[in-house]
C-alpha cells in the first residue's frame, strides 16, 4: 500500500480528486442513514439514486447501514450471507450478545449491500445507553420522544457494529463512515468519543431548527445571526434533538450540506461552517426519454384532460387545447412550500387573464397529502358522468357507422335523416341532461377532516377561486399521493409531471428541492426560488436560467408582496407563450438533465470522502485545500435560439440607413453621449449596494440625447415578456369578481 497519496484537480472545476484513480482495495465505505430501505422522506431518494454511482466507485467495499423494518425487508431487501469472513464474524458476534443484525442486498439499481440493525430488539439496553450518552456527550433524551430514543438505539448499534468490524479485521482497513441527518448522528459522536479509527462525514439535508422556525412564520433569513438557538430549540421542545445534530456536526471530520443556502443556515444555527456542499442528484437514465419526451408529454396531457373533462362537467366552457396545467407538489407545509404565495399569485393571474380578455385557461393542481376520510362524491360523480357520455357516444357511433357502411356498400349515399332513430336521440338527450349541475365544480377531490381550518381551502375561500365559469384560473386540490390505481386520476406522479406545462415551487424553506429537479430531467419548465438549494445551484451554473425554463423567484431580498408580483409576472408571461415557444422551451429544459446527474454531482461526495480520509489519516493521505472562484466552474451559456437583446445587435448591412444622421465611423454629434469605460465602471461601483426592491420600476427618458440611468436593475432577467400591470389592488380583484 502506498504510504502517501496527494490530491489534485479533477475534471470537474473546483473539486479535488485523487492524482491517480482511487483504489478502494484497502478502504471500506459505510453510509449510515435511517432511510436505508426505509422510505420516510427525501433522504431515501438521495440514497436510492446515488447507490449506483457510489457502488461503481467502491465496488463490494460499499455498505449501507440502516434500521431493520419488516415491511422494508419483505419488499426491498434480499437477505444474504455476508460475503467476507470478517463481516460474518462481526454479525455473529453481535447476534450472540443480544442484538439482531441482518445482511442483504437492497433491490434497487446498483444492488448495494446493506446491514440492517433491529432497533426494537435492543430496547433492553436503552436506559443504560441513554446514561452513557449523558456521561459522554451531556445530551439527555426524554422518555416520551420515541424518535429520539430510536436515534439513541440506532447510534449505539452503529458504533458497536463499526467497532466490532474493525476488531475482526487483522489488516486494519481505512474506514469511512458517512452519516446522514441527526437520526444517525449519535453514532458519529460515539465513534469519536471512543476514538475509533474511522474517517467520519456528517451531512445535514435540513437543519432541525431551521425547519421549525420557518414553519412558525418567522422572518428566518434576515434574522439568522440574531437567533438565540438554545432558547428557540428549548421553546419548541426539540433541544435534545438539536444537541444531537449540533454535536454530530462538530464531531465530524468533514461536515457537508446539500446546498449553499443550507450551508449559510448551518453556519449560524449549528455554529460550524460546512467544509463542502454536496448537491443532490438524480438517476437521469430513469427519466430519460431522448426524442420521445415531447410525445410522452402529449400522451400524459391527454390523461389529465380526461380527468378535467369529468371534473368540470357542466361547466366545461373553456377550450382544452388552450388550457395550461400548473402544479405544486410535496409535503403539506403551507408556508414553507410556498402554497400561500402560489395561491395569491393565481388570484392575480386570474384578474389579469380576465381583464385582458385572454382565451387561455389555467388549471392549477395542488398535490399535497392531507388528512381525508373519503373521495368527494361530486368528484366521483363527474368521472362517472364522463364515462357514461363516452359509452353513449361509442354506442351511437357504432350504429351510425354500421348504417353508413351498409348504405355505401349498395352504392348509394345515405339518407342523413334516417341515420339516427328516436332511440338514439333519446339516449343523447339523457346524456346531455346528466351533464347539468347547479353547483360549481369542487375545489377539493376528497372530503377533508379539517375542512374549516385547512390552510389551502381557507385561502381559496378568501381569494374567491371557486372554479366559476367566469374564472380563467381553476384550482384542484388533490390531498393524496398520485397513483395509477386511483379511480379519480389514474396516473402515477412521473406521468402526471410529464403531462403538465409548468411546475411551481415557490418555497420559502427548501434545502434542496427534488420536485423542480425531476421536472427538469423530464423537460418540464419550473419555477423555483433563490431560497431553495436547487434554485441557487441552477442560478450558479446557468447564465440565463429563464431561457432554459428555470425561473428563479427572488424570495430572499424581496418582500412577500413583491415576490408574489414577480411570480405573477412569471405565470402571466408563460401564459402568453405560443405552443411552439413552449415546445422549444421544453427542449431547452431537457438539455439540462446531465447537470443534475449523479455521474456529475457524485464527485462532490467523492471530494468529501477524500477530505475525510486526509483529516483522519494524515500520515497516509494528504490534502491541500484551496479556494476556487465560482466563475471558474462551467456555466451553461444563453441558448443560441433566444433572440439577442436589441442593445447588443449589430447592423446586418455595412451601408448606412437613410435616417442615420452621421456615418457609423463619422464624428459624433456634440449632444450625443460618448461611452467612457472608466466612467461607466465608476457608476457601476457607486450603484453596488444592498438591493432595494420597489413595487414598480420607473423609466425616465431625456430629450436631446440618450441618457444612462444611474440605477442598476437588480431584478432577475427573463427571456419572456412580462405583463405591463402584473399587479392590481385587492379591491380591484373584489370589484372584478363582483
Curated annotation (Swiss-Prot):
Alpha-D-glucose 6-phosphate binds at residues 291-292, 294, 297, 301, 501, 582, 586. Residues 632-738 are annotated as: Disordered. Phosphorylation at Ser-8 by AMPK inactivates the enzyme activity. Primed phosphorylation at Ser-657 (site 5) by CSNK2A1 and CSNK2A2 is required for inhibitory phosphorylation at Ser-641 (site 3a), Ser-645 (site 3b), Ser-649 (site 3c) and Ser-653 (site 4) by GSK3A an GSK3B. Phosphorylated at Ser-641 by PASK, leading to inactivation; phosphorylation by PASK is inhibited by glycogen. Phosphorylated at Ser-641 by DYRK2, leading to inactivation. Dephosphorylation at Ser-641 and Ser-645 by PP1 activates the enzyme. UDP-alpha-D-glucose binds at residues 205, 211, 331, 510, 512-513. Pathway: Glycan biosynthesis; glycogen biosynthesis. It comes from the Eukaryota. One of its GO terms (biological process) is glycogen metabolic process. Disulfide bonds: none annotated. Glycogen synthase participates in the glycogen biosynthetic process along with glycogenin and glycogen branching enzyme. Extends the primer composed of a few glucose units formed by glycogenin by adding new glucose units to it. In this context, glycogen synthase transfers the glycosyl residue from UDP-Glc to the non-reducing end of alpha-1,4-glucan. Part of the GYS1-GYG1 complex, a heterooctamer composed of a tetramer of GYS1 and 2 dimers of GYG1, where each GYS1 protomer binds to one GYG1 subunit (via GYG1 C-terminus); the GYS1 tetramer may dissociate from GYG1 dimers to continue glycogen polymerization on its own. This is Glycogen [starch] synthase, muscle. It comes from Rattus norvegicus (Rat). The lineage of its organism: Eukaryota, Metazoa, Chordata, Craniata, Vertebrata.
Amino acid at each position: 500500500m502506498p504510504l502517501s497519496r496527494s490530491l489534485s484537480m479533477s475534471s470537474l472545476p473546483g473539486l479535488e480528486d485523487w492524482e491517480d484513480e482511487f483504489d478502494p482495495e484497502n478502504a471500506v465505505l459505510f453510509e449510515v442513514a435511517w432511510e436505508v430501505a426505509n422510505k420516510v422522506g427525501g433522504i431515501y431518494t438521495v440514497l436510492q439514486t446515488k447507490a449506483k454511482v457510489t457502488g461503481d466507485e467502491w465496488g463490494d467495499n460499499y455498505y449501507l447501514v440502516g434500521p431493520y423494518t419488516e415491511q422494508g425487508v419483505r419488499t426491498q431487501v434480499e437477505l444474504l450471507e455476508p460475503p467476507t469472513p470478517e463481516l460474518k464474524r462481526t454479525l455473529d458476534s453481535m447476534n450472540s450478545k443480544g442484538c439482531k443484525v441482518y445482511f442483504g442486498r437492497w433491490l434497487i439499481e446498483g444492488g448495494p449491500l446493506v446491514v440492517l440493525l433491529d432497533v426494537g430488539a435492543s430496547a433492553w439496553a436503552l436506559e443504560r445507553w441513554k446514561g452513557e450518552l449523558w456521561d459522554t456527550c451531556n445530551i439527555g433524551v426524554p422518555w416520551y420522544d420515541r424518535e429520539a430514543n430510536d436515534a439513541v438505539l440506532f447510534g449505539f448499534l452503529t458504533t458497536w457494529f463499526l467497532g466490532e468490524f474493525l476488531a475482526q479485521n487483522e489488516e486494519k482497513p481505512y474506514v469511512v463512515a458517512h452519516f446522514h441527518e441527526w437520526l444517525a448522528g449519535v453514532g458519529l459522536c460515539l465513534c469519536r468519543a471512543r476514538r475509533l479509527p474511522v474517517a467520519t462525514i456528517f451531512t445535514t439535508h435540513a437543519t432541525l431548527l431551521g425547519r421549525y422556525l420557518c414553519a412558525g412564520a418567522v422572518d428566518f433569513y434576515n434574522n439568522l445571526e440574531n437567533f438565540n438557538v438554545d432558547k428557540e430549540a428549548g421553546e419548541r421542545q426539540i433541544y435534545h434533538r438539536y444537541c444531537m445534530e449540533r454535536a454530530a456536526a462538530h464531531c465530524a471530520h468533514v461536515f457537508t450540506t446539500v446546498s449553499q443556502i443550507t450551508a449559510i443556515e448551518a453556519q449560524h444555527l449549528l455554529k460550524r461552517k460546512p467544509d463542502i456542499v454536496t448537491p443532490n442528484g438524480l438517476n437521469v437514465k430513469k427519466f430519460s426519454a431522448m426524442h420521445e419526451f415531447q410525445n410522452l408529454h402529449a400522451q400524459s396531457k391527454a390523461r389529465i384532460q380526461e380527468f378535467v373533462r369529468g371534473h368540470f362537467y357542466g361547466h366545461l366552457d373553456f377550450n382544452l387545447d388552450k388550457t395550461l396545467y400548473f402544479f405544486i407538489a410535496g409535503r403539506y407545509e403551507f408556508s414553507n412550500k410556498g402554497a400561500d404565495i402560489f395561491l395569491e399569485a393565481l388570484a392575480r393571474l386570474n384578474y389579469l387573464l380576465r381583464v385582458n380578455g385572454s382565451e387561455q385557461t389555467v388549471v392549477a393542481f395542488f398535490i399535497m397529502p392531507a388528512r381525508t376520510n373519503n373521495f368527494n362524491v361530486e368528484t366521483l360523480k363527474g368521472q362517472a358522468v364522463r364515462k357514461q357520455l363516452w359509452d353513449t357516444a361509442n354506442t351511437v357511433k357504432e350504429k351510425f357507422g354500421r348504417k353508413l357502411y351498409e348504405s355505401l356498400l349498395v352504392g348509394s349515399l345515405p339518407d342523413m335523416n334516417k341515420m339516427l332513430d328516436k332511440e338514439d336521440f333519446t339516449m343523447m338527450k339523457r346524456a346531455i341532461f346528466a351533464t347539468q349541475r347547479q353547483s360549481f365544480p369542487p375545489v377539493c377531490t376528497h372530503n377533508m377532516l379539517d375542512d374549516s381550518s385547512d390552510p389551502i381551502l381557507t385561502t381559496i375561500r378568501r381569494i374567491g377561486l371557486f372554479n366559476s365559469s367566469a374564472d380563467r384560473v381553476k384550482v384542484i386540490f388533490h390531498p393524496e399521493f398520485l397513483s395509477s390505481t386511483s379511480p379519480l386520476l389514474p396516473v402515477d406522479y412521473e406521468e402526471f409531471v410529464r403531462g403538465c406545462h409548468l411546475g411551481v415551487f415557490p418555497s420559502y424553506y427548501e434545502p434542496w428541492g427534488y420536485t423542480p429537479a425531476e421536472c427538469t430531467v423530464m423537460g418540464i419548465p419550473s419555477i423555483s426560488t433563490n431560497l431553495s438549494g436547487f434554485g441557487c445551484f441552477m442560478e450558479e451554473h446557468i447564465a440565463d436560467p429563464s431561457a432554459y425554463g428555470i425561473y428563479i423567484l427572488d424570495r430572499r431580498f424581496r418582500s412577500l408582496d413583491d415576490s408574489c408580483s414577480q411570480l405573477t409576472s412569471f405565470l402571466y408571461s408563460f401564459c402568453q407563450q405560443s405552443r411552439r415557444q413552449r415546445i422549444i422551451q421544453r427542449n431547452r429544459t431537457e438539455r439540462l438533465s446531465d447537470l443534475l446527474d449523479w455521474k456529475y454531482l457524485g464527485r462532490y461526495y467523492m471530494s468529501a470522502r477524500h477530505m475525510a480520509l486526509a483529516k483522519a489519516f494524515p500520515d497516509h493521505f494528504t490534502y491541500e485545500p484551496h479556494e476556487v472562484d465560482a466563475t471558474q466552474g462551467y456555466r451553461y451559456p444563453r441558448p443560441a435560439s433566444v433572440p439577442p437583446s436589441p442593445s447588443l445587435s449589430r447592423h446586418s448591412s455595412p451601408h448606412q440607413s437613410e435616417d442615420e444622421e452621421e456615418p457609423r465611423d463619422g464624428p459624433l454629434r456634440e449632444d450625443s453621449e460618448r461611452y467612457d469605460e472608466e466612467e461607466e465602471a465608476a457608476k457601476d461601483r457607486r450603484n453596488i449596494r444592498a438591493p432595494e426592491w420597489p413595487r414598480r420600476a420607473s423609466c425616465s427618458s431625456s430629450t436631446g440625447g440618450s441618457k444612462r440611468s444611474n440605477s442598476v436593475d437588480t431584478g432577475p432577467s427573463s427571456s419572456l415578456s412580462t405583463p405591463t400591470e402584473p399587479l392590481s389592488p385587492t379591491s380591484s380583484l373584489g370589484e372584478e369578481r363582483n
